[in-house]
């Protein structure tokens, strides 16, 4: 039941607040048309009085506002798409008007600027950028044309420039005006309350649980921030129902697939997840979720514990959200950079499992001894509230969302003919060489690289300094908290 104070507080959402929605149908710049109707569903909204402002599963109606496709590449190098969501649909089919704009697509290679989705440039790839720079070599190297031909022959990989967002794509909307939320659309607390004995047991266990994973050379890596309680079968079914995939083992085949995904700006949904240890043991399982980008994904490593709650296994997990990838010359491999706020990834994991109908209850155990800021094994700054999300699994039932089936009707995402795609790529490559294959653009390009490198370096130094500044008082607070908990 809503008390009067909570009802008054939660009856409206303010401009600037954000809502995550999930597409219920695919959208393509190649086949989409202005006016095509779209449907999505709310999956996350700001919390209010212990529940979300809008109930998960609430349908959002919208349409394609503008679309620009690449086609054969004669006019445009990149695709753009603007979608608008302007109504919420109540359970009794009433439409509530909203005003919101798109600000982010989760795990996407596409960018969003001023509410417009911007596709990738098929020639603005690692191999494409190197090719354009090789064009400057003829000014001092008469054999560079052979170099250029050899390079293009060695990397005949080009990304698809058209935009395609499949069913299940997560979009972040920002409210432009105040939204009055009807009573029937507001969420109530989801799931049943956790068993108090189970919670007390976990609170007793928490101080003895590992706080960080480590690399094989003993370097501190990710925060341990999730505990799953349930059988191995329940965990496997829960992640598959939520659309997550197992990570592949590292092999020659997986390395080739990673290279292809990196060069083609596409996803590798089962990409290997780097090995980390907990108490000297490798993860028993890894899970991940991505969309259309090799650089971005959410992933989880899990370890089975000897501890049991109500006869069920406790699985400890290290959850993080990756936002970029690069080839590390120091480590001689591809590495990913993580979202600084690791609690964001933890929340996304809990949300996805809950939407799949596989969660009996969720609660958070505070761990004051866990440092709030740290540097991971690849040099990225991380911050957290230190809490452990404890997810009690159950047999999946009544899902709010189900991933797209393999036999679902497909939409056209690119020219069907291989010949047409080959001609399009030649047109785009020629246009890129004409525009970028000159010394003026070369100087601009090198200047841009230098500025970006300097900004990235300055940002990493600043983040590292912030972490060290926060660590000093944490040491004393954590020690005092640990002593207090052990003396209870």
Q: Which role fits each region the language model picked out?
A:
Residues 254-456:
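A cross-kingdom signal targeting lumenal/periplasmic-facing segments of multi-pass membrane
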Residues 189-217:
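Compositionally biased P/S/T/G-rich terminal and signal peptide-adjacent segments
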Residues 9-187, 257:
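Contiguous beta-sheet cores, especially beta-hairpins with glycine/small-residue-rich turns
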Residues 208-238:
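Terminal, regulation- and interaction-focused segments at domain boundaries
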Residues 50, 161, 220-228, 332-340:
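Second-shell loop/turn segments in exported
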